[in-house]
Amino acid sequence: MSKSHFLLCSIAVLLFLTGLSASAQVLSFNGKVIDKTGQPVIGAAVVNTSDRSVGTITDVDGTFTLAAAKGDILEISSLGYTTTKVTVGESGDITVILQEDSEFLSEAVVVGYGTIKKKDLTGAVASVSDKDLKDTPVANVGQALQGKVSGVYILDSGKPGDNVTMKIRGLGTINDSDPLVVIDGVPTDLGLTSLNTADIDRIDVLKDASATAIYGSRGANGVVMVTTKRGSNGDGKVSVNANWAIQNVTYIPEMLDAAGFAAYSNDMLSNAGLATNPAWSNPETLGKGTDWINEILHTGKMQNYTVSYSGGNEKARYYISGGFLDQKGIVKTVGYRRFTFQNNNDAQVLKWLKFSNNITFSADVKESGSYSISSAMNALPTQEVKNADGSWSGPEGTSYWYGDVRNPVGPLYTNSNKTNGYNFLGNISAEITFAKWLRFKSTFGYDAKMWFNDNISYAYDYKPSAVEETTRYQDSNKAFTYLWDNYFTFDHTFKGKHSLNVMAGTSAQWNDASGINATKAGFLFSNVHEFDNGTVNKSIGGASSDWAMMSFMARLNYSYDDRYLLTATMRRDGSSRFGPSHRWGNFPSASAAWRLSKENWFPKNILVNDIKLRAGYGVTGNDKIGSYAYIQTYNTGTYIFGDDIVTTLMAKSMANPSIHWEEVRQANIGLDLSMWQSRVNLSVDAYLKNTADMLVKAAIPITSGYEDTTTTYTNAGKVRNSGFEFTLNTINFDSTGDGFRWETSLTATWNRNKIVSLNSDTPLYQNETGGAYITMQKNGKPINVFYGYVADGIFQTHEEVDNHAFQENSTAPGDIRFKDLNNDGVINEEDRTIIGNPNPDWLFSMTNNFYFKGFDLTVFLQGVTGNEIFNAVGIGNEGMASAHNQTASVKYRWTGYGTSTSMPRAVYGDPNHNARISDRFVENGSYLRVKNITLGYTFPKTLLKKANIDSARIFLSCENALTLTNYSGFDPEVGINGIDWNIYPLSRTFSLGLNFNF
């Protein structure tokens, strides 16, 4: 046989044998996936681990077909079940039984005096886990929550050490509408800024009345449940978190430079018939001058460290941590330092007795500084920071040339404003298990807060006026709250389908607070400012208060076959804040849910995994009015009897023993939907929230003889909030083979707010500036609407002035034309109307998470639309009426016929009152913010094993990366009333973080 024939035969035999081998190994693998009851598991994922591109999902009967070879390992997974692996054998048919994932099924939501499985919720509750908080480079837990929960509106002041403003489902009252914060079961007014984000395990936000009614008279504004971390079974583990950051201002409004200001001044004074400054006759020669805003700002720095140790066994578990935060603000001399300590322990002393304790402690120092953003914007760019001799400069000379704004830099270095705070929140509880289905728990809680303010204003001699003596103000404050909760819990399942959980008990809480303050001056030695060294007593004062509350509460949770769910609660509160005849109130609620997907008639398909309808109604209350509003109060005063001055008691406010709780009645309907093997999860809620008996301050006649005629409360107001909210979580792509995963989370909230009625048809005016009010509370309108004149362009000629309604004697071309709304021929108070609404229509956010081979990328967008801002800063900095610097927008002011149709002329004194409160200063407050971008890398365990490190991760993050807005001020987050008073500038934060566990 020739070599060529031998070669061809060999190849043929080899191919034949290979084909036989292949045909023997490749199988058409048929299988069925069922649960422990024998029911088919629909939509379970089946993947061949040898080639993860080969996979399928089970059909409506739980069956599947997949090509596989003998020895291949198939991985079967489904939401709510533990992942199972099977090996392909000789036969291609197999039945796989999936076991329930106990951890998933038992995921608990904290709802007050207990927990409930997430799948059994009937009310509107949203949760944020520690995973959602871990990478946010912020000093305040509230900042980390912004945009994470639908229905929750959070405003960040940006100032180190300040709390955020948080509102849930709109403003339900014109009074205090902050939600109740409960930390580890203890209701507290401890600010979230005192908590260490690294110590938090989860935050549950109770939004509708069926969820919040368990807190009765304090649940009207929603409840924020904070749960700190606890130990778990296993050897002790050390966790270290470190974060280093730099911060810069996100945006600075452009101001006039020296040349621009001089030109403006010349124009303003000429239009008023006043002499201009000869030194500014040629403005261009002055150049840029001093940028005062940049003089008070710098690059802020922040460092944040946490070390924790946790572990335990079946008998005892522990968690202990310490943290340190040091933040230097972007405004010079502003800063915040905080030390935190957390200790949580659980001890199973006996089989039937368990003890637990939680300790949350913080000590902080807040340096508020003596800065003034307004002064920095008003100060003249023609002025130097210091004089030639090194002293602080200041305006000196003709006032309408140089103004009266004190040097904004000097006080930063000469004054001191510091607050020391100490916060202790702790509880200890004992839980007795009488039977598997019956437990009793008793908890004693203690909440102690002490804070001390120290403010020194030093004597100075820089212009325009000197302060000849140093003054020092100090105060000392303390507040102690005690809590004692006792309740039974019955939990049992009857005949496998009827699950019943009942909680009933009592709660007692009492508080006492006091404070003293004093101001001294006339210090004998310039460098010694202890009070003993002061010779002049400026003032001394003090106050104390107390309150108590007794409560009875009960809650019932019932479930039939996980199909029909019912929750009912009742709380009865008695509060010392109201008169003896009105101290007790009842706060019931009920909610139900129907899981349609559990019905036999519901189509079993891959599209819909779970669908649940919810509905609820409840009554809650609000008692945040102070401790003594129901009784008559007195002040001390003096009266002259003959030649003697006698100390007397003066009636301060009139008693109203009939006042009682603000009452909120709220209805909620909701839908929870899970689709495509739980790759798409949607939660939708719609609500109607009515506040009745709102506490309104009633004006009484001055002739009544009371010193204060504006703070007597009466139950007279009604407010309505209605809206809907949704949360959508999706897994857009998940390829186990190459490790790429893409998740998206969307939240959106729409809310409409309206005052239904006040105590009278007379509106309530608030927020005064320049002798006029900016906001108004009026029947039929949203809370805090802006109230003012309506601008209608610019007068271009004298003829236009003459043909319009009378405004002022000095009205001239270049002045603003205001609308004569009542057509009486005169522009006056009767022509003021609603000119804006600070309440947003929509809150929204979107988070995208990407994962690939140890890398992770998060992009978080957040924003609001439909709200407006009253730019009160513009009254002074665009008013063009004084020797204050102006924003660069005044370059486009009216200087002659047709030169402007919106920006008026500059004229000293503003004879036409162009800067009166009008829609000229109302701006669109909508914004879209790239809130956070984080890029992280988790090191492979194989690399860490040699160093005995369990896990390690490094990340880079940018907070407030980009803001898209039409608002002209520093930032559109100006406060809940929508007025920009020159807020502390928001900062952009770049941070480097490191987390490791061993």
Pin down the residues of each PLM region.
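Acidic, glycine-rich flexible loop segments
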Residues: 271-288, 302-306, 373-409, 414-416
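Extracellular/periplasmic, surface-exposed regions of secreted and cell-surface proteins
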Residues: 23, 133, 178, 300-303, ...
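Conserved small-residue
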Residues: 239-287, 714, 733-838
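Glycine-rich, aromatic-lined ligand/substrate-binding cores of catalytic
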Residues: 838-870
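C-terminal extracellular loops and terminal segments
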Residues: 142-146, 711-720, 764-786, 835-847, ...
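Extracytoplasmic gating/loop element in the C-terminal half of outer-membrane beta-barrel translocons
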Residues: 280-281, 293, 464, 575, ...
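Short, small/polar-rich motifs associated with maturation and membrane association
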Residues: 1-342, 347-349, 354-362, 425, ...
